């Protein structure tokens, strides 16, 4: 037998380690065509990282308590909006413009002095601050809606008109509140189950079907997972205060099950909206269906009965959280209390890799977007590429300086494209470090 064929592959190693946080990293999100990463920690700090230079774009103390979730989106004209949810019971929306980056604070939390006061440094614009519940340790989920009530997504042309958030109810620990921006109002509540009592809401995911139906997948302290739906598109007029008062949203339960024996720690819905996966304090990872309201298997709330999950896998490793499904659905990953990051097949749910680097427990995972990566080119690099060409027009023979500028722009574009086309996996740990991996 060929000895080369039986050689054990060397363990995977991180591409880079970001050492900026002084406390556990609880939230990660890769955005801006894989060029930016936003991270949030247990002391309330938010850091926006440039994944090309691996340096901070800005850092600020966004919350007085731990950050539960952070999301970033490009909203046109080079601007970014950062959504953060903290244990100080605030859900904040921050705006970061390209022209602001030169004077925004870049001092990382690990370098900040104890005497530094929150807000004393220059930070991004605060657009909204919603009072929401954070006692459950359950992070928000969000979805963008166009004026016709159909799913939308921020782009270079701007942000959709309406944004919806799902968060735990302030009084009913098992209930789900739905908030709306820009009105900053609560528009609906899904009450907790009374029989059986599920305990606190532990994880929630809000999404909108192509027809405009509003879905909420939720997970609970007793191990239950459920799916609710509001049928019918919510057009812009539906968010008016008077309309909501006279026409409260009606919710039907499509699915419920209790595959977990311990509190559910995380769940994520597949981008195709065909299923979702949950992880728990037990060792199980479970794939669940998302019934279509028009399918033959749809059971109205009145005649409801519990259904079976699609697949249950006993991983033999308890305490896996931060579960995320990659955009192509080929793999998903979890962050383990045992300091391991585990990567699984999206189809078979078989364990594909165990990433070992951190010494302490891991809490959060983020994937880069793998969709249409070959065509990804950042707007800034594209404009940089074109400017020297314009300068050369009418100046034939005088290419010494302009030629050099063009070369620098080309190098920058190539660096951006390399980062954009990397299959990023980021993991945040109790040690405050973020490991960046290129995998599958």
Curated annotation (Swiss-Prot):
Its main location: nucleus. One of its GO terms (biological process) is chromatin organization. Residues 376-399 are annotated as: Disordered. InterPro entries: WD40/YVTN_repeat-like_dom_sf, WD40_repeat_CS, WD40_repeat_dom_sf, WD40_rpt. SMART domains: WD40. WD repeats lie at residues 20-59, 62-104, 196-238, 259-300, 315-354, 357-399, 403-440. Keywords: Chromatin regulator, Nucleus, Repeat, WD repeat. It is found in: Nucleus. SUPFAM superfamilies: WD40 repeat-like. GO terms for cellular component: nucleus. Signal peptide: none annotated. Disulfide bonds: none annotated. PANTHER family: GUANINE NUCLEOTIDE-BINDING PROTEIN SUBUNIT BETA-LIKE PROTEIN 1, TRANSDUCIN BETA-LIKE 3. Belongs to the WD repeat ASA1 family. Component of the ASTRA complex involved in chromatin remodeling. Component of the ASTRA chromatin remodeling machinery complex. This is ASTRA-associated protein 1. It comes from Penicillium rubens (strain ATCC 28089 / DSM 1075 / NRRL 1951 / Wisconsin 54-1255) (Penicillium chrysogenum). The gene is asa1.
């Amino acid at each position: 037998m060929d000895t080369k064929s039986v050689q054990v592959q060397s363990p995977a190693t991180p591409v880079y380690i970001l050492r900026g946080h002084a406390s556990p990293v609880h939230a990660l999100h890769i955005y801006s065509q894989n060029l930016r990463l936003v991270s949030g920690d247990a002391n309330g700090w938010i850091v926006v990282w440039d994944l090309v230079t691996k340096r901070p774009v800005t850092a600020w103390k966004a919350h007085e308590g731990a950050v539960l979730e952070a999301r970033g989106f490009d909203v046109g004209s080079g601007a970014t909006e950062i959504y953060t949810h903290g244990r100080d019971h605030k859900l904040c929306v921050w705006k970061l413009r390209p022209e602001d980056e030169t004077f925004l604070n870049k001092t990382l939390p690990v370098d900040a002095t104890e005497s530094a006061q929150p807000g004393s440094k220059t930070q991004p614009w605060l657009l909204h601050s919603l009072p929401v519940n954070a006692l459950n340790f359950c992070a928000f989920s969000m979805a963008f809606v166009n004026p016709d009530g159909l799913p939308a997504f921020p782009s270079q042309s701007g942000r959709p008109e309406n944004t919806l958030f799902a968060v735990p109810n302030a009084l009913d620990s098992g209930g789900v509140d739905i908030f709306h921006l820009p009105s900053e109002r609560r528009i609906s509540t899904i009450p907790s189950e009374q029989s059986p009592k599920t305990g606190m809401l532990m994880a929630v995911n809000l999404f909108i079907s192509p027809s405009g139906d509003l879905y909420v997948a939720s997970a609970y302290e007793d191990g239950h997972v459920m799916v609710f739906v509001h049928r019918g598109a919510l057009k812009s007029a539906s968010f008016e205060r008077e309309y909501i008062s006279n026409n409260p949203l009606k919710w039907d339960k499509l699915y419920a099950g209790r595959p977990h024996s311990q509190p559910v720690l995380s769940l994520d819905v597949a981008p195709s909206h065909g299923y979702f996966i949950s992880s728990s304090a037990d060792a199980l990872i479970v794939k669940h269906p998302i019934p279509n309201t028009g399918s033959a298997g749809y059971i109205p709330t009145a005649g409801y009965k519990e259904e079976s999950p699609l697949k249950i896998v006993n991983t033999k490793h308890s305490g896996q959280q931060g579960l995320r499904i990659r955009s192509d659905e080929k793999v998903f990953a979890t962050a383990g209390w045992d300091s391991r990051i585990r990567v699984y097949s999206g189809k078979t749910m078989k364990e594909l890799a165990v990433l070992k680097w951190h010494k302490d427990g891991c809490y959060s995972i983020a994937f880069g977007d793998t969709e249409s990566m070959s065509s990804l080119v950042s707007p800034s690099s594209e404009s940089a590429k074109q400017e020297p060409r314009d300068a050369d027009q009418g100046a034939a023979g005088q290419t010494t300086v302009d030629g050099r500028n063009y070369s620098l722009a080309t190098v920058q574009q190539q660096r951006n494209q390399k980062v954009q086309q990397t299959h990023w996996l980021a993991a945040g740990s109790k040690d405050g470090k973020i490991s960046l991996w290129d995998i599958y």
